[in-house]
């Protein structure tokens, strides 16, 4: 049985230091979003180092925008990402959350 080749966007190639530079999000915050909030699932090297795909980078930028610009709490972000994975409209869901005041 042939496996479908990963698209370029799904190849895990960026170490966390590079992702932090690309996104402007501190590496500690990225780790927290993964380990404490379950928002990210980066690949790991055999040595346990995180490797992120372009899709992961896009997700981090999306999380950053939602939290920092839209005022969505991380629990809401988790629900929005789950909705997107289920095929629901991500942007429509954002509008359903009132901004924090």
Sequence positions of predicted segments:
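Arg/Lys-rich, alpha-helical DNA-contact motif
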Residues: 2-21, 35, 41-46, 54-101
């Amino acid at each position: 049985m042939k496996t479908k080749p990963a698209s370029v966007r799904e190849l895990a190639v960026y170490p966390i230091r590079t992702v932090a530079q690309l996104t402007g999000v501190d590496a500690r915050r990225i780790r927290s979003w993964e380990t404490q909030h379950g928002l990210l699932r980066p690949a790991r090297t055999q040595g346990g180092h995180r490797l992120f795909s372009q899709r992961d980078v896009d997700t981090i930028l999306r999380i950053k925008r939602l939290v920092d610009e839209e005022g969505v709490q991380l629990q809401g972000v988790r629900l929005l990402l789950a909705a997107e994975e289920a095929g629901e409209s991500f942007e429509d869901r954002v509008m359903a959350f009132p901004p924090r005041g």
